[in-house]
Every structure is written in structure tokens, then in C-alpha cells.
Amino acid sequence: MMGKSGSQQLLMDEKIYVAVGSDLGNKSTLVWAIQNTGGKEFCIVHVHQPLYRKEKEKTQKILDKYLQKCRQMQVCAEMIHIKMESVEKGIIQLISERNVKKLVMGAASDTRYSMRMADLLSTKAIYIRQEAPATCCIWFTCKGYLVYKRESIMGNTSLEYASTSSGQDSVRSRGSVIPSRQFTISRGNGNVYQLAVFEAEKSKKEASLEAFKHQEVVKEKNEAIKRGKEWESAYLEELKQRKETEMELKKVREKLEKMRYISENRITESYMLVQKLQDKYNLATKVLRKAKEERDLLIKGRDIAIIEVEELRKEVSRSDEHREAPQYFICPISLEVMKDPQLAADGFTYEAEAISTWLQGGHETSPMTNTKLHHTKLVPNLALRSAIQEWLHASSSFRK
């Protein structure tokens, strides 16, 4: 069996494994390991369930801070990630696969630490103490203090006594107390007494462990009942808020429906008003276009009358000697000198009585061109009438 000083020197040469969680709650565990184990190389172990991308990035940032702390304390460190549902089983698997000789982990969360704390409180730590290979030395710390140390057994027939924070001794293999029948004790009668004390201590710790497990089960049961009541209360509150929200939503929908109905009525009224205005506009446009056409005809008739008057004046001056009526004074229908000349739509001037008789007889065409008249309105040819009257007056004077 290797001496105690030789065993300690061998442990110092091994890499120190430090188990940490997904937050900075195990920072004190890492600091204690660097300051008290004497190791120069450290391996930070993190066991986790399969993570989503955002959770993985967040966890990686926290683990990087652990590595940064190692660099600040001038020690070499690496990181190991283990994907497993059970944290404690993941650590046991790591110890077995890598033949880990030294491990530092938390005995409980820092918030549960007290000066009276003399044993492990974490179910994970208790499980690892019982199930870890006997060749691994494990320190259990809490808030920067050593709570329990499980010494390693370097051979199949050798025993190491692990000193706890309370000063008690125990012999352990794979985390559980080694049965006395597996070893031959050759230290005299005193060893028999020590074995009896050890067996009693074993029974005491097993009873304490069972009591602790029972307390944990009761605690988890009470917490589950409490969470169930909280969830039920939250569900009822959410149901109440949902009903209130549905009522508010119903009121808003009714209000919106009413506003939509009013808006549709206003739109219909506006559309009808626009249609009326459009009809009035179309009628006004039609009347204006017709008035413009009539104005153009009047202007055309006026221009023609002016030309005819000028020609008549010339004709009168030429025919003063003969005293015969000019052709323009003669009605194309009655072939007599016109007394009341009227300008028709075809641009010709007729005796009022003759053209009226023509139109009243159902004719819609021009007596001169035989084309359809645009309208049947007659316009007095005042200029021609004035010229005829002058001619008649002049003829009367000439006869006298």
C-alpha cells in the first residue's frame, strides 16, 4: 500500500475535475478547488440536457466565465460537455470512462449552507458519493467550505479513511460503505472495535440518508401540491381574464359593426348624391352644347344676312333704273317679295307664312337643298326686311 505522502503526491499529479452547473452558482466550488487541491491542470465538467440554440449560447457564455476565472488564477483549464438527462449519471459515466482520480463538486446550493452543515444535502451529491468508483477522490464543498471528502481506495485490499468536516471517519467503495467481509483486518483486537464502530456509523448514515430521502420526497410532494394550487389559481385567473377580454372584444365588435353600418349608409347617400350631381352635370352639358350649336347657327345666319344685305344694296343701286325686285327679295316658295323674311336652319330666307306652312305640312327637309333640317326654329332676318322696306319705299317714291 502506498504511503500517505506518496498518495498525496500522486493525487497532486492528477488532473482536477470540477463539476459546475449552467449558472455561476458553482463559482465558489471552482475557486476552492484551485486554492486547496494543489492541482495545476483543471477540467471543468458540465452535464446538461439537449439545449435549444438560445439556451446553448447563454450556457456557453456562463461556462466561458469559468474558464476566464481559471486564467485569472493562472491555472490551465479545459471544458467538457456531457449531454445526458441525469446529471449524476453523466458524472459517474465520466469518472468511469476517463478513470477520473479527483473530482470537486457542490454538496448543496450555496443558499442552503450553514455553519452546522455536516453532511451532503444534494441528492445528486449523495448519489455520486455512493455510486462513484472507489478509485476517485471526491471533495464536496458549499459556499467555499469543504463539507465532506470521500477518499479514494488505490488498491483492492487497501483502505483510506476520509475525514469529514465533522471529524468523523468512514471507509467507502464506489461511494458506499465497504462491507467488512470484503477485507481482512489485521490490526489486532482494536480493529474489531473499529469495525463495530464503522458498522454502526454505516447504519447511522444509511438511516440518515433514508430519512433525508424521505424528507426530500415529502418536500417535493408539498412543493408539487403548492405548485398545483398555484397553477390552478393562475388558470382560474387566466380564465377570468379571458372571459373579460372576450366581453370587451364582443363590445368592440358590436361598436365596429355599428360604425360600419353607419359608414355604409353614408357611403350610399354620398353615392346617390354624386349620381344626382352627375345627372345634373350631364343635362347642363347637353343644354350648353345645344345652346352653343344654336348660337353658332345664329352667328352663321347673321353673317349670311350681312353678306346678302350688302349684295342687295348693290343690286338695288344697279336696279334703280329698272325698279325690279332683287332676287333676294323673292321668297323661294311663294315667289313673291317677302314682307316678313325668316332665316331657316338651311341658311336660306323665306316668307314667314310660306315656310311655316311648309313645316306644318310635315316637311323636315330644306325647300332649297332637300336636306334634313337640324331644327325647325326660324330667326327673323331683320337686315333683309329693312332692305326690302327701303326698296319698297324707294319704288313707291319713284312711281310717284
UniProtKB/Swiss-Prot annotation:
EC category: transferase
Biological process annotations from GO: protein ubiquitination
A molecular function (GO) term: ubiquitin-protein transferase activity
Transmembrane segments: none
Coiled-coil boundaries: 229-298
InterPro entries: U-box_ubiquitin_ligases, Ubox_domain, Znf_RING/FYVE/PHD
Domain of life, source organism: Eukaryota
UniProt name for this protein: U-box domain-containing protein 37
